[in-house]
UniProtKB/Swiss-Prot annotation:
This is Undifferentiated embryonic cell transcription factor 1. The modification Phosphoserine is found at S15, S18, S48, S54. Its main location: nucleus. GO terms for molecular function: HMG box domain binding; TBP-class protein binding; transcription coactivator activity. Residues 279-310 are annotated as: Leucine-zipper. It is found in: Nucleus. Residues 1-62, 144-270 are annotated as: Disordered. Acts as a transcriptional coactivator of ATF2. Residues 154-170 have a biased composition (Basic residues). The gene is Utf1. Expressed mainly in pluripotent cells with expression rapidly down-regulated upon cell differentiation. It comes from Mus musculus (Mouse).
Length: 339
């Protein structure tokens, strides 16, 4: 049983001789030549720690311009961007080295913060189309070009493992495309066995040979007495015509409508659209035939309304004249009586 080294106290700084216990307990990737190259050559000072910044001692303030410039400068070093380019799925060890390099320059940022910061800058540069350029756009473009991130954002794909079910679209395509291949192979194997070994083929008949010759037997005329006779001693099985695998003949293991369904499946959608359009046009013709008489009836009703309006005007004028005449006659009669 391996004994883990005792964790150093939080208040005591890590010594140069002993690396941080968190790095060793996490079981990180061992130091390679690229790691040694990253820690040497201007990035590491003599006597500085090589461990990344822990979340407890990291800064929680927003990134400043100096911190962003140091982060991009660290990522643009060949050891860093080559490590990110070689292993895209496991970028955390590389960002641990970036965090350690920034810690030596008095920037306390965790590996996750460094990764999120670069992703934020990359997305912001992609979204800033037609806007004025920022102070770090050239470095971000250079880093994106080195890492191959200058194209459109990638769609994350998950590899189908042994325990992961396949998607429905892929399974249906794989079920349709390579389905006839095993049938043809199974049909070719018995034929080769019959040609190579005639006697065992007659003695032991497999189900595959029976199923392969079922279509030939059903389509051929009924057997006569000569066909039922056993073969002659000198007559071998090779003299009989061997059935050649014909792609037009349906195999017994394949459903009868599968080959026709494959040929007509691309034409199903256009036929259904044409049928729907024809039905729509037929319904529109029926509607027009129904609306024609209704239009005639509405025009007739409009004429009747006009006639009724004229007769109503005449009736009103006659009534008004009758009322005025009766009033005038009453006035004349009353005037004569008073005189």
């Amino acid at each position: 049983m391996l004994l883990r080294p005792r964790r150093l106290p939080a208040f005591s700084p890590p010594s140069p001789a002993s690396p941080d216990a968190e790095l060793r307990s996490a079981g990180d990737v061992p130091v390679t030549t690229s790691d040694a190259f990253a820690t040497s050559g201007g990035m590491a000072e003599p006597g500085s720690p090589k461990a990344p910044v822990s979340p407890d001692s990291a800064q929680r303030t927003p990134w400043s311009a100096r911190e962003t410039e140091l982060l991009l400068g660290t990522l643009l070093q060949p050891a860093m961007w080559r490590s990110l380019l070689l292993d895209r799925r496991q970028t955390l060890p590389t960002y641990r080295r970036v965090s350690a390099a920034l810690a030596r320059q008095q920037v306390r940022r965790t590996p996750a913060q460094c990764r999120r910061r670069y992703k934020f800058l990359k997305d912001k540069l992609r979204d800033s189309q037609g806007q004025p350029s920022g102070p770090f756009d050239n470095q971000i473009r250079q880093l994106m070009g080195l890492l191959g991130d200058d194209g459109p954002p990638r769609v994350r794909r998950r590899s189908t493992g042994p325990g992961r079910p396949q998607r429905r679209g892929r399974s249906s395509l794989s079920a349709l495309a390579p389905a006839p291949a095993p049938v043809e192979q199974e049909a070719e194997l018995p034929l080769a066995a019959e040609n190579d070994e005639p006697a065992p083929a007659l003695r032991f008949s497999s189900s595959t040979t029976k199923s392969a010759g079922a279509h030939r037997i059903t389509s051929s005329p009924p057997l006569t007495s000569t066909d039922t006779l056993p073969p002659e001693p000198g007559h071998t099985f090779e003299s009989s015509p061997t059935p050649t695998p014909d792609h037009d003949v349906e195999t017994p293991n394949e459903p009868p409508g599968l080959s026709q369904g494959r040929a007509s499946s691309p034409q199903v959608a256009p036929q259904s659209l044409n049928t729907a359009l024809l039905q729509t046009l037929t319904h529109l013709g029926d509607i027009s035939t129904v609306l024609g008489p209704l239009r005639d009836q509405l025009s007739t009703l409009n004429q009747h309304v006009e006639h009724l309006r004229g007769s109503f005007d005449q009736t009103v004028s006659l009534a008004v004249g009758f009322i005025l005449g009766s009033a005038a006659s009453e006035r004349g009669i009353l005037g004569d009586l008073r005189q």
